[in-house]
Amino acid sequence: MMRRVSLLFWLLVATLGFTACVRTTEQPVSTPPTQPTATLAPLSPAFLPTSTLPVPTPRAQPERMGTFFFYWYHCPERACDASELTAIPPGWLTPLPDDPDPRDGLAYSSINYDWFEGELRDLVDVGFDLILPVSWGDHPHPWFRQDRLDLLVQANGILEKPLPIGMFLDTTAQQAMYNDFVADGYRFGPTIPRMPLSDARSGYFFYDLHIKGFFERIPREMWATEQGRPIIVTYTALCCDELYRAGELWRAVKEAFRADFGVEPWLILEETWFTPEALAPGEGLQPLELVADGRYHWGTALHGPQTATLRNFSVTSVGPGFDNRSIVGITDPRLQPREAPPGGGPPSNGAFFRASLAAVPPATDLLLIETWNEWPESTGIARASHQGVDGQPLPDDFYMDLLRRWRRGG
């Protein structure tokens, strides 16, 4: 049941000048989707890689490196269709190697403690400085709800040096939550109505139902921070309409966070939030650039490396390639082969990722790898059974090792 009074609801009512009543009746039960829809890259590439591979040169390393970590899997029962994958990770079809405890399963699953621990150890070994677990709030699927973060925290806590944890706020969830709220069911996608930011309740779906619960489950000593402020990275603005109010929305979110946690978050928004109307919203409304702390590009696993800078804070994102053609029901199949050099030329193992890493500016404050383990879109660099250009299996840690050696300057 929705709470009668939400801090952020009344903040938004006050700041946006709207009045509305929060519905307090029990929400209708909707039929959840079979699995979360994969987060698709924006349709229009903003970057085309150069026609030749950059030549790596000695360089200063980015200040920090993080990655998007997906825990929406529950093999072998759910969200585990091998026919949608181009590379199979350990634990997907067969038990995880060296999993000592069958009581919580032996598979690639967010209910399996040993899966979390194994992933975290690999992340540390590669050289990541922080991780960004993808979050949809309390998704209808029990294996992808906020409480699954408890196992992540538990596994992280046994590491010699726990990985700092930030939030990857998948805004697809806001579209789904809003449609569920207005009695249309938990639905999302390009043909589904978007959430209007002029609705004073919009902040409730971002903060109270999502962001707040995430950070309540991550101990403060594990927060990934920038200048002492916990990091939130958002997905695209495809969830929402009326983006001229985006600055007001995110200002209210930051104020509500500060009221609950005593500090404002470091907010890194995806580039699609920065529309002309969001940047120049009109008299009396907050321009988005004055509210956000950083900006970045999603879709670099498909389109190539991108860097965005806001007030001297630079974020670069890169990925190894992209292939969503096997996803059931996909209406926009796209491909960036991993072995294809940007602009053409003889294929080689990991060519797209190598070129992307070589293009990272040395002054980057935060490098984001897209992704650690988003398998249906084939953007993961974690352990998996990739094939080489000769048709032979690559080592399951091929992409991990490629990044590890690059990070260490090799």
Locations of the language-model features?
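Residue-level detector of intrinsically disordered/flexible regions characterized by low predicted structural confidence
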Residues: V5, T25-P28, E374
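Short amphipathic alpha-helical "recognition" segments used for binding
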Residues: L7, S30-T31, S378
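A general secondary-structure boundary signal
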Residues: T19-A20, G409
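Ser/Thr-rich, Proline-interspersed low-complexity disordered segments
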Residues: L11, T15, C21-R59
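Glycan-processing catalytic domains of CAZymes
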Residues: F47-G410
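Bacterial N-terminal signal peptides that target proteins for export
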Residues: M1-L8
